Amino acid sequence: MKKIAFFGIMALTVSCFIAAAQNKKSMKKVLFVVTSHDKLGNTGEKTGFWTEEFAAPYYELLDKGVTIDVATPLGGQPPIDPKSEDPSAATEDTKRFDADTELLAKLKNTKKLADVKESDYDAVFYPGGH
């Protein structure tokens, strides 16, 4: 139930971004903020951002002409939750993500959040992760 609610909220948020981008010519730039956290508490279990929760809104916005930058608290390569890369979690968006060399290169060198100027962006989006 939580997952359905989360995706419903995510879809509504993305829809608002899209509607605003279509209706407001100046809305063209969104900052995606993903985690730098790579371990789940003191369990030693690897974690990071969830690929589908990043990829679905990323491509929805990108395909509407929105420019997207990516930042993390520490800058650099954000960790991906290994469970999100399981074949059972694959979707069209995650397959596109895996094949997107331009995006994968961008993710290797994300901006450090402290260095981001908020006035450069029309919106900020936080994909899921720990």
Question: How would you describe each model-predicted region?
Answer:
Residues Q22-H130:
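Extended, subdomain-level signal for the structured scaffold at the beginning of enzyme domains
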Residues M1-K25:
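Bacterial Sec-dependent N-terminal signal peptides
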